[in-house]
């Protein structure tokens, strides 16, 4: 378990859940199975979750199945997070996602993902799919685009139904068309704070599966 990351980001206000009775709230069955002191059983349950939840992110799924060294649930105040550790040289790196809610703002396959796992971000850079609580409409998400060509495109799309859903942990920020999730043809958009060319009308899952897996490979 990555005590370094847990204490750095949550201080002392957290509890690793090693018993189902300590969860204290309703969770999907594939989450509940991770609440055990047996590491091999935790990993087995986590792999089952990955195969079910990351069905549209095959590259990310493959890396998680191959490289995850431990997975566990953490209670943080009234919330529950899933943490997945992996070894990178001489340090342990972790991703985290939050317990899902019954409803999602998204439809289709994106909504199905968020009803199973509320976001999936790198603990250190916060790069990855944001939890819904942090998702904001484009133009209200705190990101500013001053450099062309992203600045020009931003002026065109800021009045549309794009929402900031992916943080690259660097210069790029990812968006999704809310309407496209309702018809289950999710459309991704990537804007940059430098002069790189924006990526428009992208297949959402292909785009962010690729970005997530590249980030995991680089680490």
Please annotate each region the language model reported.
Residues 155-160, 166-219:
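A recognition module on extended beta-rich or small alphabeta surfaces enriched in W/G with H and D/E
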Residues 1-172:
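A surface-exposed partner-binding patch
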């Amino acid at each position: 378990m990555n005590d370094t990351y847990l204490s750095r980001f949550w201080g002392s206000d957290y509890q690793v859940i090693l018993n189902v009775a300590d969860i204290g709230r309703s969770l999907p069955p594939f989450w509940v199975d991770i609440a055990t002191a047996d590491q091999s059983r935790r990993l087995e349950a986590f792999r089952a979750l990955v195969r079910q939840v990351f069905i549209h992110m095959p590259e990310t799924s493959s890396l998680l199945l191959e490289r995850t060294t431990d997975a566990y649930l953490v209670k943080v105040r009234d919330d529950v997070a899933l943490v997945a550790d992996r070894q990178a040289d001489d340090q342990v790196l972790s991703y985290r996602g939050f317990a899902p809610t019954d409803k999602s703002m998204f439809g289709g396959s994106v909504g199905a993902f968020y009803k199973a796992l509320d976001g999936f971000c790198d603990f250190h850079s916060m790069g990855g799919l944001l939890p819904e609580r942090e998702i904001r409409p484009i133009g209200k998400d705190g990101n500013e685009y001053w450099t062309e060509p992203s600045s020009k495109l931003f002026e065109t799309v800021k009045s549309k139904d794009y929402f900031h859903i992916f943080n690259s942990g660097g210069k790029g920020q990812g968006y999704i068309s809310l309407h496209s999730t309702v018809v289950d043809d999710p459309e991704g958009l990537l804007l940059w704070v430098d002069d790189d060319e924006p990526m428009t009308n992208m297949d959402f899952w292909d785009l962010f599966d690729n970005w997530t897996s590249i980030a995991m490979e680089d680490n």
